């Protein structure tokens, strides 16, 4: 794992934000952000998710949306985020990485662009007009 700088903004009020170093974690589906930091910028939960943690425990946590900006990519996108406990690491998960169209390169410790797969098998199947 390696870290990247991320700006986290409130989608409804982009002037409310903070910058933080996030661990790139391809094993985490969602990005994890300590809930007090999300609350500070006015992000509110939209629902909950059942999570399987790395140590095998299960937990139910709040889920919200935040605008994530990764300066090295020069792009901002709204991504789902988990309201994590106060002592949690900041994690940039697989959903955000896919949204940005990047993969983690552990050799260079950088995010690298990837081609998006659209529809997989169905998109490549021959089409019949009727």
Would you name each region that the model predicts?
Residues 1-130:
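Pepsin/retropepsin-fold aspartyl endopeptidases
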